């Protein structure tokens, strides 16, 4: 299974921190967000990675090549990162993932490696890991029906109907 990591965004809400550094390379403690994600994925057996970059692409490429030189990493550049969102970045991966199982995640989330393990060992075809907390207007919200099937994933859906924020695994995109 391949890991698809979306890392194209500008993260303008974090300025001035992101004026010279992409959000995924910001450190929490001793390690940056992207390093934490890579370590968790490698710990769970991932050895193929697709990274969609945009803003400050070369910094991300340089970091990953320096820290993970033996990993199989495909870089895809979203040249429209200033005017598009994660859905477009994901769309750019289609020729690399067509019909294959993937684990999809944003590059700027902090998660326990055990979440990846639980996702991988699920008997479900398509699953999402959700963080249940009070949601703001900028979070991507998830709406489910009475049978717990996902019916909408969006920033614009009503917070009152959302059950959590997505940190996705989708088996076939």
Each language-model region and where it sits:
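Conserved beta-strand segments of alpha/beta enzyme cores
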Residues: 24, 72-74, 149
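N-terminal nucleotide-binding beta1-loop-alpha1 segment
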Residues: 1-18
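Conserved N-terminal catalytic core of the sugar/cofactor nucleotidyltransferase
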Residues: 2-5, 31-101
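Short beta-strand/turn micro-motifs composed of small residues
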Residues: 7, 53, 106, 130
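Conserved core of the sugar-phosphate nucleotidyltransferase
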Residues: 112-173
